[in-house]
């Protein structure tokens, strides 16, 4: 029997609440604190109800957080301009996202999920975000653009990780962002 629109919306709202609660727990206490039991208790449902929404349990919830995180990051990186003109704002948006959402960024960077990267099976939102990096750094060929985008992504990730662990001087954030943008600016 088909679900009513009201039932479908109720299910969607509960799933959003589960994911939002997982993010809150992770931001407060780290990902190791995110368990099915704690999530069920926090939102006031039984564990079987939670599994009904996410049959893969915690792993499926974390994967959803990762996809949502990449969706939010892509939205943040949609900056005005085209190509290399977007590089400074894109660098700033990426680093701000990682700084403002440390637990989500941690999951995006290191959680073991079923998400496939650098493949035709990569989710569209991840390909879109990577495409923004490719267009910003440019290159003489598809391969050159992909490598330059991977290097930019790796650089931004490294900065994000060092900053998250207080290994960089926060007073230099703007200078660092400008330096990364200049480093990856296209050269004729």
Region locations from a protein language model:
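N-terminal intrinsically disordered/low-complexity leader segments
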Residues: 1-13
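Generic hydrophobic, amphipathic alpha-helix propensity
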Residues: 14-22, 39, 65-73
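Helix-turn-helix
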Residues: 17, 21, 25-60
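Amphipathic alpha-helical linker/stalk segments
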Residues: 65-89, 118-127, 133
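Helical hydrophobic small-molecule/effector-binding pocket
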Residues: 88-109, 118-121
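Amphipathic alpha-helical packing segments from all-alpha helical-bundle domains
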Residues: 109, 115-151, 173-185
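Amphipathic C-terminal alpha-helical segment
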Residues: 153-170, 185-188
């Amino acid at each position: 029997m088909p679900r009513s629109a009201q039932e479908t919306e109720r299910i969607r709202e509960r799933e959003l609440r589960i994911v939002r609660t997982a993010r809150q727990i992770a931001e407060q206490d780290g990902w190791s604190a995110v368990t099915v039991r704690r999530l069920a208790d926090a939102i006031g449902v039984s564990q079987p109800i939670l599994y009904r929404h996410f049959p893969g349990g915690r792993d499926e919830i974390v994967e959803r957080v990762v996809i949502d995180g990449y969706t939010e990051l892509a939205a943040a990186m949609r900056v005005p301009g085209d190509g290399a003109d977007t590089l400074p704002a894109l660098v700033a948006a990426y680093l701000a996202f990682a700084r403002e959402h440390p637990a989500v960024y941690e999951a995006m960077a290191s959680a073991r999920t079923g998400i496939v990267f650098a493949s035709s099976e990569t989710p569209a939102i991840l390909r879109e975000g990577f495409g923004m990096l490719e267009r910003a750094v440019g290159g003489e060929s598809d391969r050159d653009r992909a490598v330059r985008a991977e290097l930019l992504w790796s650089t931004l990730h490294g900065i994000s990780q060092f900053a998250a662990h207080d290994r960089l001087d926060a007073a230099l954030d703007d200078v660092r962002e400008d330096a990364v943008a200049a480093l990856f600016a296209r050269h004729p």
